[in-house]
Amino acid sequence: MENKIFSVAEISQIFKEAIEGSNYFKNIYVRGEVGNLTFNKSGHVYFSLKDNQSTIAAMIWKSNAHKLTNLNVKEGMEITCYGRLTYYVPSGRVSFEAVDVSVEGKGDLQEIFEERLKEITALGWTDESRKKPINRFAKNIGLITTDSGAAIKDLITTLKRRMPSVNIYLFPTMVQGETAKFDIANKIQQANLFEPKLDILIVGRGGGSYEDLWTFNEMKVLKAIVDSSIPVISAVGHEPDITLSDYVADLRAATPTAAAELASISTEELLKELAYNYENQIRLFKNVYNNQQLKIEEFKKQNILKINNKYDLQSLDLNYIEKSFINNINNIISRNEMFIENIESKTALLDPKKPLDKGFGLIMSKDKQIINSVDKVDINQEIKLVLKDGEIETIIKGVKKHGK
């Protein structure tokens, strides 16, 4: 029988099929010391894993590279990689393709979190004294989050429901991945230069894994929040999720919806606040009045004693004192009336139906969706015009866009 002679390509292909086709080399963990760490411009990361006896080449593709960079992995650190063995035919080299990474010892995410918290605390970034108050009567609110998903919808819906007059400006950004920290920091800086001037910034995202939320623990993002001249509300994830952004922001919200509620005041809350202030003013008025009455009675008693003891004491003009007291009371009442009128005028501005009294109308589709652009209507579409005293049903005959 003639001996089989293999070409180099054939034997390499046999090796490849044997290694990559075997379940034994899939879904395995390899632990070793990091060496030859290279961050390729393509986004892939190449390195080696070694111990006292051997070395193996390893790589992690761009899609999973953040799992390594988030851990601040450096050469000499011991890590555990999860993945599979591969065989590269052109060079005849066996490599380990990692899809996940964990760091041994002090390098895991939780310890990095705790060390970074100590660092920002020492810098004074978490001090309550440096945090700015939140204006709940904000006119302009900026949202720094992704432009898709439940978080942005919840934010806009809640803000508009509670405070219809508010202006909302979205600064869309990546919220996870290797470059997300730079994107978020840049958007915070852009928002601080934006015109009209913003009253509040809400920075955050919806829920995700601990690793998904890690961007909001990055120093680049934390520094941008601290440097913001606009008050920042941190709204990352769900109730149990805590990030370092929560520590440095001016206010922490458990969820994006909660952030919208903290950034606004509803009509019901406003009326309660007005009632509370009114009751305080009445209480103050009564206290002033009662104190003045006590002073008058005490004054009368003292002067009666003087008159009884000294017959030559001239009568005091109590009418003058009473007139002065009445003038003081009238001044207090006038100030309270001006305060209440001012509050009532601000409350009227929050009424979404007020513009209808001036001849404006609200355009709605048949399914009661508000139409605010010609792009949202079609020819022959039935629509409703809501006026202050009723509704008009009509049909679109033509559409003309401004500037065209």
From Swiss-Prot:
Task: Indicate the segments annotated as coiled coil, or none if absent.
Answer: none
GO MF annotation: an example: exodeoxyribonuclease VII activity
GO CC terms, sorted: cytoplasm; exodeoxyribonuclease VII complex
Q: Which UniProt keywords apply?
A: Cytoplasm, Exonuclease, Hydrolase, Nuclease
- Where primarily located? cytoplasm
Any one GO biological process: DNA catabolic process
The answer to whether the entry has keyword Nuclease is yes
* One Pfam family hit: tRNA_anti_2
User: Its Enzyme Commission number?
Assistant: 3.1.11.6
Q: List the disulfide bonds.
A: none
What the entry lists under CDD domains is as follows: ExoVII_LU_OBF
Keyword match Repeat: no
**Intracellular or extracellular location(s):** Cytoplasm
| Catalytic activity from the UniProt record | Exonucleolytic cleavage in either 5'- to 3'- or 3'- to 5'-direction to yield nucleoside 5'-phosphates
Summarizing the function annotation, the protein's role is:
Bidirectionally degrades single-stranded DNA into large acid-insoluble oligonucleotides, which are then degraded further into small acid-soluble oligonucleotides.
Self-association state and partner proteins as the record states? Heterooligomer composed of large and small subunits.
What does the sequence similarity comment in the record state about its family? Belongs to the XseA family.
In its UniProt entry, what is this protein called? Answer: Exodeoxyribonuclease 7 large subunit
Question: Which organism is this protein's natural source?
Answer: Mesoplasma florum (strain ATCC 33453 / NBRC 100688 / NCTC 11704 / L1)
